[in-house]
Amino acid sequence: MGRIRQKIKVDGRESWTLFDTGARNTYVVPEVAVLLTTSKLKDPFRSAIGGEHKETKATALLEAEVEGRRISTHAMIVDEMGRDEEGKRIEILFGALAMQQWGIRLIPEEERLDLSHYPEEFVGVKYILDIDPSAGS
């Protein structure tokens, strides 16, 4: 497991972020969520963050800049995630699924992110349907 801490920009606001390969999902606190598109959940989800159980009643579409590169990913909204080793409040916990989605790798020994696998373009898949005009007649 690796962890890197740094600020990322959400709607121009810098947010203290913990990139953590030991966390599957991504989480944001309400102060960040107010800058995002959110939706309420029909039923709450429960997660364990930092050894504590948290309840999520809403989710957000996290659109942000990581070292100048745009990302967009799904995030759970939780009231609090605690503080890092330096006592700074964690506002975003960027999990392994989002890191994989955006080609973000951690270099813990240098305390930095590796964005060399960031997708510069997205390739769509074209589906071709062979329709037999005589079928179903």
Model-derived features: positions:
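Pepsin/retropepsin-fold aspartyl endopeptidases
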Residues: 1-137
